[in-house]
């Protein structure tokens, strides 16, 4: 649930994609200007309420989806009283081509702030390879647990 991801303010839930069917979604705005880092994005704003609160450390979240890439450039997490407890912002988006030449819009730098403690963590992806075939051993229980085959 809310376990820290390698000692940061990110949790394992923050680093995983949630299935859209796990939440009830409400469109709050179709055209909101949202400043994030050095950029301003034209966003769809969506309120997402988890259908099950089990293993979830927030009551609901507000997501700001960039209308050009459909990437959530900002996510605000709220508790039951409506107080913002955490905020995640993508401070660097980048378009990269994979080995096949296909272009992908990707989050390069994400920053998360714990509003209760003031602690902040920055996750930076320094390098990546796209559209590359992966060995099946990367998905074994041992590899996923230890990083070793």
Regions found by a protein language model. Give the residues of each.
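Gly/Pro-enriched, hydrophobic low-complexity segments
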Residues: 1-18, 37-138
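A short, amphipathic edge element
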Residues: 15-32
